[in-house]
């Protein structure tokens, strides 16, 4: 063999020995944050079917990402309503149970340290009388007199 004709190593069977391109993950291609490759691996490893199509993990990752974003947005709103900066399991429970569709989807799910929804049966509430209903709830501001020092 001639010294001028060297065999390039590291091409890995690819044509051309130029600089290697940066790998682009399937999550980036699909514009997702959830890991498409890992979900595909779990689908194959779990033996849910003999074969798994190439689009199945992408679709499943998109669905899971949407559900996570929906729950987190509602839980963030619940945390803000309670004047908190951190989402707690209580906020997750309030978010899920106050949303009709998520409540139906997660009907049999128990959230640890979530508590229960605040609910008082109307029968247990004190009855309103007619005189209390007609009277104003708070005195008007015109009747108040300023305090004298």
UniProtKB/Swiss-Prot annotation:
Name of this protein: Histone H2A.2
Keyword Acetylation: yes
Major subcellular site: nucleus
Modified residues (N-acetylmethionine): 1
Organism: Pisum sativum (Garden pea)
Gene Ontology cellular-component terms listed: nucleosome; nucleus
Region ranges (Disordered): 1-24, 128-149
Role played: Core component of nucleosome. Nucleosomes wrap and compact DNA into chromatin, limiting DNA accessibility to the cellular machineries which require DNA as a template. Histones thereby play a central role in transcription regulation, DNA repair, DNA replication and chromosomal stability. DNA accessibility is regulated via a complex set of post-translational modifications of histones, also called histone code, and nucleosome remodeling.
């Amino acid at each position: 063999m001639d010294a001028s004709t060297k065999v390039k190593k590291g091409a890995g069977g690819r044509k051309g020995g130029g600089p290697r391109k940066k790998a682009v993950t399937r999550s980036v291609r699909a514009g997702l944050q959830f890991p498409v490759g890992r979900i595909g691996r779990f689908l194959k490893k779990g033996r849910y079917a003999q074969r798994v199509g190439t689009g199945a993990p992408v679709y499943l990752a998109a669905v899971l990402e949407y559900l996570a974003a929906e729950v987190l947005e509602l839980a963030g709103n619940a945390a803000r309503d309670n004047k908190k900066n951190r989402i707690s399991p209580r906020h997750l429970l309030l978010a899920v149970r106050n949303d009709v569709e998520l409540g139906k989807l997660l009907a049999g799910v128990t959230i640890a340290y979530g508590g229960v929804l605040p609910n008082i049966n109307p029968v247990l509430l004190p009855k309103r009388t007619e005189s209390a209903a007609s009277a104003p709830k708070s005195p008007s501001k015109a009747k108040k007199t300023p305090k004298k020092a």
